[in-house]
Amino acid sequence: MEYFIVPYLLWFLYVVFMVLYLGIKDQEEGNKLIAFLIIGMTVFLVISAIFPNGLRLRPTTFARDNIFVDMVKKLYSVDTSTNVLPSIHVYNSLGVMIAVARTKLLKNHKIMKNGLLLLGGSIICSTVLLKQHSMLDVMVAFILGALAYVVCYREELATRTSLSSAEIE
């Protein structure tokens, strides 16, 4: 499981790269991604201020000794397991995955698109497998993501709903 440190650490580049890429190449989608991220991180800060939280899931001993275990140990030493609900790694990864799925820039680049979606899924899995977050942290991030999706993409949802209603009639 220690190998999941790689996608976990790639999260930083994943989010920054996609914000910059979409901000330059697809401003409409980039702005929606930024709004999505701002909503989630603001809610996270409010929750953490009102309801400080934490976990005690991390192991104290490891079955193997390799560079990836060393990286996990270093992560544990610099990143406390406090204020983990909801998981910002999960929430921001969801936001990037939504933007990747929606942008027209990747329409003809299936390998890149699927690779970015796979990386996002791996990042989400890594949060639990590295014992950085519980399933509750992940579920709350998904719920928050669904709510933020409605806020950030409501125009498309309204258009899609009205089109579906027109097709029924």
Predicted regions and their residues:
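Aromatic-anchored segments of alpha-helical transmembrane domains
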Residues: M41-A49, L118-V128
